[in-house]
Amino acid sequence: MFNNNRIRIAMQKTGRLSSDSIKLLTSCGIKINLKQQKLIAFAENMPIDAMLVRDDDIPGLVMDGVVDLGIVGENVLEEERLNRISQNSEHSYVTLTRLDFGICRLSLAVPVNTTYTHINSLKNIRIATSYPHLLKKYLDKKNISFKSCMLNGSVEVAPRAGLADAICDLVSTGATLEANGLREVQVVYRSRACLISKNGDINTDKKEVINKLMTRIKGVIKARESKYIMLHAPINKLEEVISLLHGAERPTVLKLAGDDNRVAMHMVSSETLFWETMEKLKALGASSILVLPIEKMME
């Protein structure tokens, strides 16, 4: 049984978001003994219990208040919200933050030998999908009538099997579509993982834990998006060097021993440092340029 004073968080047991969700909690310093054969895993160092379930069960568990938090793809979340609206069921929740993984898109695709010139090319055809509500919402806005073929898996084989004329499915790289003789023609919905909470009263103790967890999650994501930069630069080019590096704060500038014309500069850059930027830094006279990953960060 769950202890009512502990935070309950629903996570995908296996699949696309499972390992990234576990990695996120681990990076936040939460020690959870995760065993895939178990439904519930308990944190050793924080009052947090993880419920390991199917991804399409997570929105309902949060909306119904069975768990306090959930990590789920926005595509699954929105599909369940639309489904519940159609059934006049409880569908409220709060998005605490979007996460930096599970990035994909829900797209329409047709066989490569099919003529497609405009969204109107999809009128009155049969479309296979696992996301009927998202598909209907999108095509209704375009005033496109269609026939839906609901499939819970292997959607990409539907045209070859004669079940549908087109599909609406998740796409990451497009390799699966290509392997099945399909081409992407229209993006329906863009998605990534998000952290959600139930929409209702949460006691003070739980709020404190959730706030602490949120601070850590934001710190982990910020660290992933940032790099620690160290370099030597000419004093007379310092402002030009700084202008190339986008940071939350001004850099630390230190004197170099035995060199009055150059300084050492340290800063956290909030953007990915590309080779082109490094080449521009070098052209300004910067040297000993080091770009280091950041494990944890708190502003």
From Swiss-Prot:
Q: Where in the cell does this protein reside? A: Cytoplasm
Tagged with keyword NADP: no
Judged by the first EC level, this protein's enzyme class is transferase
Pathway the protein contributes to: Amino-acid biosynthesis; L-histidine biosynthesis; L-histidine from 5-phospho-alpha-D-ribose 1-diphosphate: step 1/9
Q: Which residues cross the membrane?
A: none
Q: Which cofactor does it need?
A: Mg(2+)
Which InterPro entries is this protein grouped with?
A: ATP-PRT_HisG_long, ATP_PRibTrfase_cat, ATP_PRibTrfase_CS, ATP_PRibTrfase_HisG, HisG_C, N-reg_PII-like_a/b, N-reg_PII/ATP_PRibTrfase_C
In the record, what terms sit under GO molecular function? Answer: ATP binding; ATP phosphoribosyltransferase activity; magnesium ion binding
PROSITE patterns found in the cross-reference section: ATP_P_PHORIBOSYLTR
- Keyword field: Amino-acid biosynthesis, ATP-binding, Cytoplasm, Glycosyltransferase, Histidine biosynthesis, Magnesium, Metal-binding, Nucleotide-binding, Transferase
Q: What's the EC number here?
A: 2.4.2.17
In terms of Pfam families, this protein maps to: HisG (PF01634), HisG_C (PF08029)
Mechanisms controlling activity: Feedback inhibited by histidine.
Which superkingdom?
Answer: Bacteria
Is the ATP-binding keyword given for this protein? Answer: yes
Family as reported in the entry's similarity comment: Belongs to the ATP phosphoribosyltransferase family. Long subfamily.
Could you tell me what this protein does?
Answer: Catalyzes the condensation of ATP and 5-phosphoribose 1-diphosphate to form N'-(5'-phosphoribosyl)-ATP (PR-ATP). Has a crucial role in the pathway because the rate of histidine biosynthesis seems to be controlled primarily by regulation of HisG enzymatic activity.
- Do you know which NCBIfam families this protein is assigned to? hisG, HisG_C-term
* HAMAP family cross-referenced by the UniProt entry: HisG_Long
Q: How does it assemble?
A: Equilibrium between an active dimeric form, an inactive hexameric form and higher aggregates. Interconversion between the various forms is largely reversible and is influenced by the natural substrates and inhibitors of the enzyme.
Q: What is this protein called?
A: ATP phosphoribosyltransferase
- What organism is the protein native to? Buchnera aphidicola subsp. Diuraphis noxia
Which lineage ranks, top first, belong to the organism behind this chain?
Bacteria, Pseudomonadati, Pseudomonadota, Gammaproteobacteria, Enterobacterales
